[in-house]
Amino acid sequence: MKTFTAKPETVKRDWYVVDATGKTLGRLATELARRLRGKHKAEYTPHVDTGDYIIVLNADKVAVTGNKRTDKVYYHHTGHIGGIKQATFEEMIARRPERVIEIAVKGMLPKGPLGRAMSRKLKVYAGNEHNHAAQQPQVLDI
């Protein structure tokens, strides 16, 4: 018996929609990363992108535990000398709530071209509306 290896052209990808209202950020991101990689499927292959497309709604209503709302700090560098920037979780939620979930999930995906391809299948929206109705996404309860 031969070991099964998924081929990129034969992988079937579904579309799912997830509501992030009241969900804990880390627990939500863990499940999203797992599904983006395709580890929930029987035909999972580490070197092939077998994951599904996921739409996340209400990113501005995601929850964190403890004092992370005020204490968690996100850093990024502009590339210029002395260009380190920082923002707290509250500031990120106020300015760009989608980035909070994108950063959390991206850190849980593989680094490299395959991980970037997986992260492109994540669509995050701050509100309750999305423009992917043509894909007929199924509701995913996490």
From Swiss-Prot:
The lineage of its organism: Bacteria, Pseudomonadati, Pseudomonadota, Gammaproteobacteria, Enterobacterales. This is Large ribosomal subunit protein uL13. Part of the 50S ribosomal subunit. NCBIfam families: rplM_bact. It holds the Pfam family Ribosomal_L13. Disulfide bonds: none annotated. This protein is one of the early assembly proteins of the 50S ribosomal subunit, although it is not seen to bind rRNA by itself. It is important during the early stages of 50S assembly. The keyword Ribosomal protein applies. It comes from the Bacteria.
